Regions:
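Bacterial N-terminal signal peptides
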Residues: 23-36
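N-terminal secretory signal peptides that target proteins for export/translocation
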Residues: 1-20
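Short hydrophobic alpha-helices and adjacent helix-cap/hinge residues
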Residues: 41-321
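Generic N-terminal simple sequence motifs
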Residues: 5, 12, 29-32, 153
C-alpha cells in the first residue's frame, strides 16, 4: 500500500531540501587546479568553495562546478567551515552553515548557493555590512512563486483551493496570493500559532484541495514530515513538495533545481566576475526540473500530465516574461 511505502521511505528524506549522505573518500581542503600548469598566474582570479558538510548535494555541486569550469584557467580550492576562510578572491559558500561562516569572515567577494531566499535574507539581517553591494550575492535554492503556481494550476486544473501552512508568514506571501489569484486558485492560509502542527494541519486539510509545502523548518522537518505525508494521504489532499526527496517520499510533485543545474549557473557568473569583479544581485535558479510521483497520483485517483509536459509549460511561461 502507498501508506506503507510512505512510512518506509520517510527515513530516506533529508530536510529541508536535500538528503546529504556521507560518502567514503570525500576529502576536503583539496586544491583542484583547472589550468594546464596547475598554477595561478599573477593577478588571476582564485575561487574557493566552502562546503557546509561532506558528500551529498554539497559534493555534487562542487564536482559539477569543477567540471563546468574545465579549460577556463580558473583554480578551484575546496575547503570546509572549520578551515581558514581566504581573504582574497571569490568564495562560494555552499549551504547555510557555510554561508554563515563566510559572511562573518573577511572574504571580500561571496556567492552563496544551496540556501533559500529566506535564509539569505536572514544573513543580510545578521550581517548588515554585507548588504547593498556587488560583493555579496546568492543563487537561491527555492523556486520563483510563479513556477510553483503554474505547476499547481497545470497538474490539477479542476482543483482550486490551495492550503498553505506556516509558522510565520513567508516574505513572499503577498506574491503567492497574487500568483495564485491570477490562475484562478484560492489560497487557504493558516498559521500554526498556539496549535500543534497536526491540529493546524487537520483543520487546513478540511478546506483544501491540495497542500503547498514551503521550506519552513518549524513545520516541515524530520520529526513531522512523516505524519504530514500520511495525513495528506488519508485526507486525499495531495502535497506539492519543494524537492525531489519529497516526491520520492510521497508528495505528488515538485519543481526544484538540482545541484548540477545551480553549478552551471555559478560557472557562468564566475566567468562574468573574472572580467568585472562585480557580483550580480541575488537571483533564482535559471534551470529547473519537475518530478511527479505517478504512484501517488494513481492511488489518489488523479489523472495528471507528465513531468516533461509540466516542465515545458513552466519554461514557456518563463520565456514569455
Amino acid at each position: 500500500m502507498l501508506q506503507e511505502s510512505i512510512s518506509g521511505r520517510i527515513d530516506l528524506l533529508w530536510i529541508p531540501v536535500f538528503r546529504f549522505a556521507s560518502r567514503a573518500g570525500c576529502a576536503l581542503a583539496l586544491l583542484l587546479p583547472l589550468c594546464p600548469s596547475g598554477l595561478a598566474h599573477a593577478g588571476q582570479l582564485t575561487v574557493t568553495v566552502v562546503q557546509s558538510g561532506d558528500g551529498g548535494a554539497y559534493q555534487d555541486f562542487t564536482n559539477a562546478l569543477r567540471n563546468a569550469l574545465l579549460n577556463q584557467n580558473i583554480p578551484l580550492a575546496v575547503t570546509g567551515i572549520n578551515k581558514v576562510i581566504p581573504d582574497s578572491g571569490l568564495v562560494i559558500a555552499v549551504g547555510m552553515k557555510a554561508a554563515e561562516t563566510v559572511a562573518a569572515s573577511d572574504a571580500p567577494f561571496v556567492l552563496n548557493v544551496l540556501v533559500t531566499k529566506a535564509g539569505y535574507e536572514k544573513l543580510l539581517r545578521n550581517f548588515p555590512h554585507r548588504a547593498g553591494s556587488h560583493t555579496f550575492s546568492a543563487i537561491y535554492l527555492d523556486q520563483p512563486v510563479s513556477r510553483q503556481a503554474h505547476l499547481i494550476a497545470a497538474i490539477l486544473p479542476d482543483r482550486h483551493r490551495v492550503g498553505l501552512l506556516y509558522s510565520t508568514p513567508p516574505g513572499e506571501l503577498e506574491q503567492i496570493r497574487q500568483e495564485m489569484g491570477k490562475r484562478g486558485l484560492r489560497l487557504r492560509e493558516k498559521a500554526v500559532g498556539t496549535q500543534s502542527v497536526p491540529e493546524a494541519l487537520q483543520e487546513l486539510l478540511l478546506d483544501s484541495d491540495m497542500l503547498l509545502a514551503l521550506p519552513d523548518s518549524a513545520i516541515y522537518n524530520n520529526s513531522s514530515i512523516r505524519n504530514i505525508l500520511l495525513a495528506t494521504y488519508r485526507s486525499r489532499v495531495p502535497l506539492i513538495g519543494f524537492s525531489s526527496a519529497y516526491v520520492k517520499a510521497g508528495a505528488l510533485c515538485a519543481v526544484f533545481s538540482a545541484p548540477e543545474q545551480i553549478a552551471a549557473q555559478v560557472a557562468s557568473l564566475i566567468r562574468q566576475f573574472s572580467e568585472t569583479r562585480l557580483l550580480p544581485a541575488a537571483q533564482y535558479p535559471q534551470e529547473f526540473e519537475v518530478m511527479v510521483n505517478e504512484r501517488v497520483a494513481r492511488s489518489l485517483g488523479l489523472h495528471v500530465r507528465s513531468a516533461i509536459e509540466l516542465r515545458k509549460g513552466i519554461k514557456d511561461e518563463d520565456g514569455s516574461k
